[in-house]
Amino acid sequence: RLLVRQFLDPRRSHLSIVVDTTPDSYTGGEDAVELAISCAASLAMRSILDEQDTTVVVNDQSASRTTAPLTLDSLARASVGPVDVFASSGEASALAPDASVGLLVTGSHRPFIQIQRALAQFEVEVIKVALVIDPDTEVGVRRLGDITLLSVRELADLQRVLFSGVLA
């Protein structure tokens, strides 16, 4: 419930999104990375349209507190390839020290301990979310420690996990 409230309250929300562009992190390689970037773009656009501060870090590209077109441009220009998600999360945290939600988009092959360490780059009070892209997973939401884990197979699943799982 708090995650949704953070998404919907523009007076205090700042969504910070990090995208893992390492093809080996995903079932489906580069196509799955493109899906991850599409999910990040969808979340970023919703956040910006709701007049919330938004930061994205995707491999060699970043955008913070800017317009929708510039944010989409950064996402579109990002290269697919190995990335240090720990360093990327650190960059996102530095760009958005006031973030209320830190979100890492990754694949099912990224070890959970690495997800935890990456999201730990955000302040303690930041809501930590991992969006895992996996064509073989059960779509849904679960909680692992202080991390909310959203699992989707395709872009169409994103709205369902945000509204059905987080509100439940």
Task: Please provide the spans of the model-predicted regions.
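Exposed, interaction-prone extracellular/peripheral surfaces
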Residues: R1-A168
